UniProtKB/Swiss-Prot annotation:
One of the record's GO molecular function terms: DNA binding
Modified residues (N-acetylmethionine): 1
PANTHER family attached to this UniProt entry: NUCLEAR PORE COMPLEX PROTEIN NUP155
Region entry Disordered, spans: 21-50, 1372-1391
Organism field: Saccharomyces cerevisiae (strain ATCC 204508 / S288c)
Comment field (misc): Present with 4420 molecules/cell in log phase SD medium.
Protein name: Nucleoporin NUP157
Family: Belongs to the non-repetitive/WGA-negative nucleoporin family.
Length: 1391
């Protein structure tokens, strides 16, 4: 899996450009000059600093700062305002610099803005080859002659030959009559000849196929147009093997008489358009498909611009009839005009617009739709003249009626400019830019937006007296601006259709130059003159992107380059080096030079292929290494430092170049340019001030960091700009046919190696030269620091970022070393059923490269966990832990610490323990003990997933007791201050920072509980054997005992409480009653307040320990608690509590016991009343059903206050018996109120309907009142106020109107059954009879029955009175009362 660190660096080396001998510090003086100037510089009067245009949103964040020593030098660089320079974390600080510089790079000015050159275009121009020296935009890199065999075949052409370049294939094509020759650009000896085509080839074109038409390997179609047919061939090209295969699809369309002249396609839809040299300005579409039916063939053609009638008539029919040509012109909407044909087709692939150029220099623009073309919008000479008048550009001989002719049209992509649609190149070298608008249904009018005239010798002579150096005022001025001289030039470039504009904005054309003159020729009229005095040159004019970026000034570097012969075609071989896909930042070549391949342009001549390469800024700087002032003048010190750093680290450069670049990067140009941080308050060369330059927020607006720092940050920014915001890992859901989800890394391994090698070189460079750039880093949070201190802080942060990037890329490279295993691991960890939850998976796959380069704690943790899994897999495969540790430390130290090393070694011992388990258990145990010791030492760095894996292995090795002990110690290690206990004690606030420690402990304890559960389950399965009724411990029981012994020996209160909580949660609360631990009782007492289950356990635990008073107290509290208990259960608790009170024999607890007993009885009485109420309400029919259920629910819960029972239930529902019981329990003593309740009770019984229709009403009443009186009397008879016997006796006696209606003793018997004594009844009846109260006769009758019943039940009375006295008692008379003397003699009082 592991390999040695990457040693080979990426070679960016290019062929060194040879600067002209005259090149010095006058780079901006290289203006057009003539031979009479004697080599003196021709200077412009317009400063690059005069007009700086920057977006407002960029200006809000960035300021302009100067970082030069000499007043005549000025550098426009970026001063990034970062808040909290001294308080930010270094990686975060460096990341902010990178992100802000990247923002600046993405927002450089738009390339083509008419304000740039409304008064003429500024050129750096020389009419000599290589006259611009180091600033020549292109250099010829390669010349490949067309093979002689190919030229020989072309020389035999009889009818027509043509040539061009297939950019997509890197092949040149050459036609000769009916032969098509494909010549490999990369291998000049390889070519293919297709000679099976029957007729002369007129045009060939490579196009993209329609989507979903051919197999995926077919990426291009070769369209071959002959005199009679258009053939559609497929081409498959293998980029790796460069194998080219051409297949005949059998698709062809008849085009007899068309003379096809142009073919082009719209890549988005695959539509193919073509025109014919004999078909006027019509545009046709070539249609094809893979199916054929009765009405449609596989391929056909349709005219998109003719009228519908003309499209229906046969093509050959109309011209053949008399006057047919005139009819055809009328149908085509072009009657009365001369013959006009299409000379060029151009498609704007970004907007879906087709432009056509006709032989009369008329441009027609159509909107491409699925049904054809919409339009056209026309651009003709009159339209252009009106546009030029509006722009103030009049009377230019280059655009006169005689000279005006369009040579080429070039579309401009939306990515390059939102407004500009089209560039038109005239034969005089003028470039016209048109802007427009577009909707879904049509194109708006195209208006002339700007004009670029070519450089002229006249403008050169006018400008030669306007010399200046950037930062100086012009020495002389002239009233005539460059626009007037450029548009009035009498010399011009003879532009052909081979001219082009390559994005971004690079203009190429071919010129013919006289051998003895510096002027450009209009044309060639004599062949001998061409051979002897003229030569072909390549004219190139490229925008100076650096000046545009830094100064908002548009300048073009224009030069002539050598070429071999007449130019046939100019095409780019590589993609554009645009930095963004938006107009802002699009043309920032400084930002894209490290991420985009240098632009290469292929120029095809009649006998060779020439390749020209764009000179990147580092190549320009290298050419100026001895005197970089011109580079600094144009592009600024920050760019110069960035480029110098790049050259100092570049592979395969000479020591001279590297040392010179390093010298400039370190010290600038001594005495001329200094590179150091400075205060904005400094002036001249005053040393940095030492006062506090920071405000209270920590921002250092008063300090401008050095160009060296910004140059270094720019290089880092641009090296990783393409991946900085990209996701690191990719994830794709499995389709129905795939077995598992697809995981991987978003960049390829070659990309990883490229980035890693680049950053490694930078890391090595800064590690070596760090003391030169970082002096003293002030402590974090410092306020009073100097500019030098601020520079050290920023540079130190950047160096840390470089090393962090290196470590991150090394990590990814390690993953790539066994990518299949890594993908499988990701599926295990991050898959649908993986270890991590959905939030973690989402976070992981949202990780971007800048998150990995500047990782926060969560990112580090996640990557570390994955890395541990990778390491474990390698250890399992037999790799040494020491070797792994060394590799990890060497490659990415920030992801591998000393604690990680201990973890890896512990993992190695754990792996060894598994291997020796079956061989030697003693050795296995030794390895296990060592692993446990190592894991404990690095406990704070072990993640839960890794800990779980370790525990699983230990359990498999039957090491449960020591595993539990290890986990207990592990928990103490990760929470040394027992912060988890503090977190719980403070109320478990989720915002409490101690929650982290709580969660960690809980996770560890969960692993212990899982072990306990497995041991318990195993024990329950295995029955313990017994011999002679003596139990013998089985292995499972012994294991369980040892595990529980380790648990009970723990002195951590928090662990015990968590363990008991787990037992209760898993319905194992009975275990608590069997545990011998000092923490059980405190736990039960604390948890009982909030848990019914624990409360039950608590009283039972106390009862088991014979703490009866405390158990009764718990039961009493439980009965009166707010727990969800039914009333019957509360009554049961009270009954149990009362029984426990009676069981207690402790003398010391007697007072507390008496008090508790009284409380229990009081609550029990109330609960009994509530229970009776509950039963009554359940059967109540007088109230609403919903209210009855609500009242029942209320009563069948906690014991309610007597007032609630009375007011809410007993009184509204007239439960008189309940009310009387409430009076008794509440000790209510208002006789009037109580007697009133008795009256209402008795009245209710009188008025109650008899349940037996046939019974006598008096008997029913007597039975009812007897039952009621007995029930009430049993509970209230000891309270005379609540159970007034005298009052009740009178009321009952009065209720019997007829004394014969009542059986003897019917009244007294009910009182006796209610618990009233005979003596008390005797006194009450005597008083009634004596005072003649109420029904005296019935009272006397009841007295007779009472005395007899008393005599029978009282032995003492029988011994005092003769039986005859009782027998002869028939009617009561106070004078003959047999009991009167007995009562008086015995001095009986009322009982």
């Amino acid at each position: 899996m592991y390999s040695t660190p990457l040693k080979k660096r990426i070679d960016y080396d290019r062929e060194t450009f040879t600067a002209s001998a005259s090149l010095g510090g006058n780079r901006l003086r290289n203006r057009p000059r003539d031979d009479q100037n004697n080599g003196k510089p021709n200077l412009s009067s317009r400063s690059f600093l005069s007009e700086r245009k920057t977006r407002k949103d960029v200006l809000n964040k960035y300021g302009e700062a100067g970082n030069t020593i000499e007043s005549e030098l000025r550098d426009v660089t970026t001063h990034v305002k970062i808040s909290g320079l001294t308080s930010s974390e270094p990686l975060q600080l460096a990341s902010e610099f990178v992100q802000d510089l990247s923002f600046r790079d993405r927002n450089t000015p738009i390339l083509d803005n008419p304000d740039y050159y409304s008064k003429g275009l500024d050129y750096n121009f020389s009419d000599e080859v290589g006259g611009l020296g180091a600033f020549t935009p292109f250099q010829r890199q390669q010349v490949t002659n067309i093979p002689d065999e190919v030229l020989s075949q072309v020389s035999n052409t009889e009818i027509k030959s043509d040539m061009g370049i297939f950019l997509e294939l890197n092949y040149c094509w050459i036609t000769s009559d009916n032969k098509l020759i494909l010549w490999n650009i990369n291998n000049s000896s390889e070519y293919h000849c297709i000679d099976e085509i029957e007729h002369t080839i007129l045009k060939v074109k490579l196009v993209k196929p329609s989507p979903n038409t051919f197999v995926s390997s077919v990426e291009n179609l070769l369209i071959v147009a002959t005199l009679f047919d258009i053939y559609i061939l497929t081409i498959s090209f293998n980029d790796r093997t460069h194998e080219l295969n051409i297949f005949n699809t059998g698709l062809k369309v008849n085009v007899t008489g068309f003379n096809v002249s142009n073919i082009i396609s719209y890549e988005r839809t695959g539509q193919i358009f073509f025109t014919g040299a004999t078909d006027g300005v019509n545009v046709w579409e070539l249609q094809y498909n893979c199916s054929e039916n009765l009405f449609n063939s596989k391929s056909n053609k349709i005219c998109l611009t003719k009228s519908n009638l003309a499209n229906l008539l046969p093509t050959k029919l109309i011209p053949s009839i008399p006057g047919g040509k005139l009819i055809q012109k009328v149908l085509e909407g072009d009657a009365g005009t001369e013959e006009e044909t299409i000379s060029q087709l151009e498609v704007d692939q970004s907007r879906g617009v087709l432009h056509t150029l006709s032989t009369k220099s008329i441009v027609r623009s159509y909107l491409i739709t699925s049904n054809g073309l919409v339009g056209p919008v026309l651009i003709d000479a009159a339209h252009i003249r009106r546009g030029m008048n509006a722009l103030g550009v009049k009377n230019s001989p280059l655009l006169s009626n005689r000279a005006f002719k369009i040579a080429k049209i070039v579309s401009i992509s939306m990515c390059e400019n939102n407004d500009l649609f089209l560039a038109v190149i005239t034969t005089t070298g003028v470039r016209l830019y048109f802007k427009g608008s577009i909707s879904r249904r049509s194109i708006g009018s195209l208006k002339l937006d700007s004009v670029k005239f070519p450089p002229t010798s006249i403008s050169s002579s006018l400008e030669q007296n306007k010399s200046f150096i950037i930062g100086h005022h012009p020495l002389n001025t002239h009233d005539t601006g460059p626009l007037s001289t450029q548009k009035a030039s009498s010399t011009y470039i003879n532009t052909t259709c081979a001219s082009t504009i390559i994005s971004p904005g690079i203009y190429f054309t071919c010129v013919r130059k006289r051998a003895n003159s510096g002027e450009l020729s209009k044309g060639i009229t004599n062949k001998a003159l061409l051979e002897n005095k003229e030569e072909h040159k390549l004219y190139v004019s490229a925008p100076d992107y650096g000046i545009l970026k830094n100064y908002g000034k548009y300048v073009e570097n224009t030069a002539l380059l050598d070429t071999t012969d007449e130019i046939k075609e100019i095409v780019p071989l590589t993609r554009s080096f645009n930095y963004t896909s938006t107009p802002q930042g699009y043309a920032n070549v400084f930002a894209s030079q490290y991420s985009a391949e240098p632009l290469k342009v292929a120029v095809l001549t009649s006998n060779a292929l020439e390749i020209y390469c764009y000179r990147t800024p580092d190549e320009v700087f290298e050419s100026l290494i001895e005197n970089p002032l011109p580079f600094i003048h144009s592009y600024g010190l920050s760019e110069a430092c960035s480029t110098a750093l790049y050259l100092a680290c570049k592979f395969n450069k000479s020591e001279h170049i590297k040392s010179s670049a390093l010298a400039f990067f370190s010290a600038g140009i001594p005495g001329v340019v200094e590179i150091k941080p400075k205060s904005s308050r400094e002036s001249g060369s005053v040393p940095p001030i030492s006062q506090n330059l920071f405000d209270k927020s920590g921002e250092c607006d008063g300090i401008v960091l050095s160009p060296r720092f910004y140059g270094s940050a720019l290089l880092i920014t641009r090296l990783f700009s393409q991946i900085w915001e990209e996701r690191v890992f990719v994830f794709k859901r499995a389709s129905k046919t795939e077995k598992m989800d697809a995981f991987g890394i978003s960049i390829t391994r070659p990309q990883v190696e490229y980035y890693l090698s680049s950053i490694s070189v930078l890391a090595d460079f800064f590690n070596i030269h760090r003391p030169s750039f970082v002096s003293f880093v002030p402590p974090k949070g410092s306020n009073a620091i100097t500019a030098s201190d601020a520079e050290s802080i920023a540079m130190n942060a950047l160096i840390l970022l470089i090393n962090s990037i290196k470590d991150a890329l090394s990590l990814i490279n390690v993953f790539y070393e066994d990518i299949d295993a890594f993908k499988s691991l990701l599926n295990t960890l991050m898959g649908a059923g993986g270890v991590y939850d959905s939030k973690t998976r989402e976070y992981f796959f949202d990780l971007k490269f800048h998150d990995l380069f500047t990782p926060n704690a969560k990112t580090k943790q996640l990557i570390k966990e994955i890395l541990i899994e990778v390491v474990n897999a390698n250890i399992a495969s037999g790799t040494s832990a020491d070797y792994i540790v060394n590799v990890l430390k060497e490659r990415f130290g920030s992801f591998c610490h000393s604690a990680d090393i201990l973890c890896y070694r512990a993992g190695e011992h754990l792996e060894a323990a598994q291997k020796f388990e079956m061989i030697d258990s003693k050795i296995s145990r030794n390895h296990l003990d060592t692993a446990i010791d190592l894991y404990e030492r690095c406990a704070e760095n072990i993640e839960l997933c890794e800990l779980r894996r370790v525990v699983d292995i230990m359990v498999k090795l039957n090491y449960q007791p020591k595993t539990v002990g290890f986990l207990l110690r592990f928990a103490d290690k990760i929470d040394k201050g027992n912060q988890a206990q503090e977190y719980v004690s403070r109320g478990c606030n989720t915002a409490d920072p101690r929650k982290v420690f709580y969660d960690k402990r809980i996770n560890v304890y969960t692993l212990i509980f899982e072990i306990v559960k497995s041991v318990d389950d195993y024990t329950s399965i295995e029955q313990s054997p017994s011999i002679a009724n003596i139990s013998i411990f089985s292995p499972a029981s012994s294991l369980k005992k040892r595990v529980y012994s380790v648990i009970m020996n723990s002195n951590n209160r928090f662990f015990h409480y968590c363990f008991y909580d787990w037992l209760v949660a898993n319905k194992r609360q009975d275990y608590l009653l069997r545990l011998d631990s000092q923490f059980v009782l405190p736990y039960l007492k604390e948890r009982a307040e909030k848990s019914l289950e624990i409360s039950n356990l608590l009283w039972f635990y106390l009862f088991k320990e014979e703490h009866f008073l405390e158990a009764a107290d718990v039961l009493y509290a439980l009965a009166s608690s707010d727990f969800d208990l039914k009333l019957s259960e509360r009554i049961e608790c009270l009954a149990r509590a009362n029984g426990l009170c009676d069981s207690s024999t402790s003398f010391d607890q007697k007072p507390a016991l008496v008090q508790l007993s009284e409380n229990i009885h009081e609550l029990f009485d109330i609960a009994s009343i509530q229970d009776d109420l509950l039963n009554l309400v359940r059967n109540e029919t007088r109230i609403d059903e919903d209210y009855r259920k609500q009242l029942t629910l209320k009563l069948n819960g906690r014991v309610l206050p007597l007032s609630d029972l009375f007011n809410d239930c007993a009184d509204p529902l007239d439960y008189y018996e309940i009310k009387l019981r409430i009076f008794k329990v509440s000790q209510f003593k208002d006789e009037k109120v109580i007697q009133g309740e008795w009256n209402r009770l008795l009245d209710s019984m009188k008025n109650a309907p008899s349940p037996d229709v046939g019974s006598v009403g008096q008997e029913s009443f007597l039975s009812s009142i007897s039952n009621t009186l007995i029930r009430i009397g049993k509970t209230t008879r000891d309270t005379d106020v609540v159970f007034p016997v005298h009052f009740l006796m009178n009321k009952i006696l009065e209720s019997f109107i007829d004394k014969s209606s009542a059986a003897d003793g019917s009244v007294c018997s009910m009182f006796l059954l209610a618990g009233v004594s005979h003596l008390k009844l005797y006194y009450i009846l005597s008083r009634i009879i004596e005072n003649s109260e109420g029904n005296v006769e019935l009272a006397k009758k009841e007295m007779v029955w009472l005395i007899k019943d008393w005599y029978q039940s009282d032995s003492d009375l029988r011994g005092s009175i003769a039986p005859e006295q009782i027998k002869k008692l028939e009617k009561y008379d106070p004078n003959t009362d047999p009991v009167q003397d007995y009562v008086k003699d015995r001095h009986h009082g009322l009982k």
